[in-house]
């Protein structure tokens, strides 16, 4: 890792190069000045030059060596002479090392240097705090303090980075990561493999997947229903489709059921042996053979179940990051949202809002779909048709705002059919479809059409 002095020297070089480009190239002057508004300059001379450039720009005055020098004199800035501005202009125009580098690349380099500086400071201060009193202080208290410092470091780093906007054409045309490149990759995936889910995952249900990409990368997805309607069953069914049939990596955080109970549901789903028979043990030799075969099937899958009773939001967020970093999961399921506790404890509504915002941010940060199960309020029971609505989401309207997709399950107890309604879809259409539900195996399937 670089030392602070090395990072600071590099940042001063970038400051110099950016101010030179702002002085010479009028087409990028405004952009550069806008990106440096909240930047903490490492060189006081560069800070004063930036202030002068911004003053000239804000007052519709030309930014030249002469105009900048006159303004510096008016402000009685004594540590800069006119020759420094002249050299800055010359280097921006003719220096072989500086001239070819675009201002956007320099701004990216400055963001990286700022992040390195923040990270170095975080490690240094955390190490010093540990060494101050390593034996007397509770390790849990120390970890909490380090975690708080890390959160502040991350917030500072990304708040500075997010200030910088980009032109529409840059976003469209950027190599590898631009919109055009992504569209071409989607087309290639569809043309070569008939794959319509380059940026996401199919649920495994044709009636849903043909109408939209629900599990798009970065999506925060809510599956909502009243108790005992099939939220967990649907989540497990989709997880099986992704992990076993699509050979992708899945993380499943169960706050309600044990890992063993989840696996029993998976076995029942795969074998068709009812959950009740698995619990009672009233199994035939043929059924035992099917269960062993199912074990061979799940052995080669990458479905990771976490059920260690971690209800605190910060611990769940850390667990999700570890699943992404260590197990490289493609999707996360959480069962369920109302069991999570947040440190924002003014009231339950604010707590749920904090949980929702955090999970939404994690989905975007890790660029994977996060699917969270949620209960509905009792208002849906008071409605004549029992059809769920967005306003039925329990405890907080923030869930409705944060979610990219909200999927409702509606099932009459006497009917084997479930209505699956996409009540919100930020990036596509809303729709409804019907799936068949087998309560014995907790399995959803397409309704067989009779011709």
From Swiss-Prot:
Superkingdom field: Bacteria
A Pfam family hit: DnaB_C
Keyword Secreted part of the UniProt annotation: no
GO-annotated biological processes: DNA replication, synthesis of primer
One GO location term (cellular component): cytosol
Catalytic reaction equation(s): Couples ATP hydrolysis with the unwinding of duplex DNA at the replication fork by translocating in the 5'-3' direction. This creates two antiparallel DNA single strands (ssDNA). The leading ssDNA polymer is the template for DNA polymerase III holoenzyme which synthesizes a continuous strand; ATP + H2O = ADP + phosphate + H(+)
Name of the protein this chain belongs to: Probable plasmid replicative DNA helicase
Source organism of this protein record: Chlamydia muridarum (strain MoPn / Nigg)
